[in-house]
Amino acid sequence: MKKYVHLMLAFAFLGTGQLFAQDNQECLQNLSIFAENAKVKNYAAAYEPWLKVKSECPSLNVAIYSYGERILKDRIKNGTDADKTAAKTDLIALYDDWIKYFPTKQGKSKVGDILSSKAQNMIDLKMGSAQEVYAVFDKAYTEDPKSFTNPKRLYNYFKTLYDIYKSGDSTVSMSMLFDKYEEVSEKFETEATNLAKRLDKILKKEESGEALSTKDLKRRRIYDTNSNAIGVFLKNLDAIIAKESSCDNLIPLYQSNFEENKNNAVWLNRAAGRMKSKECADDPLFVTIVEALHALEPSADSAYYLGILNDKRSNSAEALRYYEESISLENDPYKKAKTLYKIALELKAKGRKSKARSYANKALSYQPSLGKAYLLIANLYASSANDCGDTQFDKRAVYWLAANTARKAARVDASIKKAALKTAKSYEGRAPSKTDIFTEGKEGASVTFSCWIGTSVKVPSL
């Protein structure tokens, strides 16, 4: 009370400007103190001055929230039981104040990032029900999908809905679950493409022999880390939906929803894609959906699916015509790369190896970081070992070519690096041994493959 009176007197005699300036000066001093401590991870010492600034000048500086998040997390980890309980509540509330006072950064909204961080911490700290967590994730995605990019949080956005669905909650239907999966999956693809665009600039420098700057190397490490995270969580996302998206579930679901959505290009495209990925394309419903999609809105996707239909009917020439139409209808180079890759997969399945490699290489010309295209080519080479070369040594030498190609996949695409290196090692294990090289006297020689491969590989040195 005494302090309150003194403040009122000060207000009366000094005026609001001077009083607020003094308060602000104290806040600035405390801001400096807690920020310096937080920078060196002395979060315990940062707590009290941070709390004062947070209470008295919540709009002073965004550091109140960026460092505040770390300070409270440290308190949750290292504080007393009472401190931990209070800090958990304070941390969740911090995100709401963050949005209130600093919803943007450099003129761009950060609401999606902040809210998704709040939802993730609600999961980590077991604060709130699955429905409450999902509501926060959904608000983040609905209000600001652009800054909602964290792979782990995107995955948990869908997984939370999946958990609600599996709990028997009638508010979440199978149709809603699949729709949300498609949304989140497409978001992952968007983020992967954004990373690929940045990475490809660096790869082109490498390919041209230009030395990478320190900044380029740092960016490459960041891109590789993020690309790997996207790969891991997208794989986990697909694993969850795989449990539900059997043909037995998909076909009756899409049959019941077709009439309502036959003029909805987004729905038709997603339904066709899901049926294709789950190998339900032999069902007549797939034909119905694809033909409706192409009639409604001819696109790269619809033409691609028509190519598949004609391949299944053994109309190879017509299938290829639709595949080419698919490529011509796509203007975005990264989407074009994905379409070319999908066509390469279809051609590989039909045993048309040379054509499949051609399409895979075209895909790489649009997206040099598309590692799975290199893996596809490596597999094409490895599967031709018995068909290329006149001697057993030369036949097995194909595996060196396959291994080299798989290693290219690992070099350009961190999201599949582990699998690509494992594949390369497997191929090398099937190639001629050092004893074979010595016996044949072929160290450093070139082995040329006159089959469809039409290239050569250098025998390793002993």
Please annotate each region the language model reported.
Residues 50, 88-91, 95, 137, ...:
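Hydrophobic/aromatic packing residues within the alpha-helices of TPR/SEL1-like helical repeat arrays
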Residues 35, 60-61, 70, 111, 120, 147, 159, 264-265, ...:
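Residue-level recognition of tetratricopeptide repeat
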Residues 53, 98, 140, 292-293, ...:
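Canonical positions in the second alpha-helix
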Residues 56, 101, 143, 295-296, ...:
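Structural marker of alpha-solenoid helical repeat scaffolds
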Residues 22-285, 421-427, 441-462:
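Preference for long, solvent-exposed alpha-helical segments and helix-linker "stalks"
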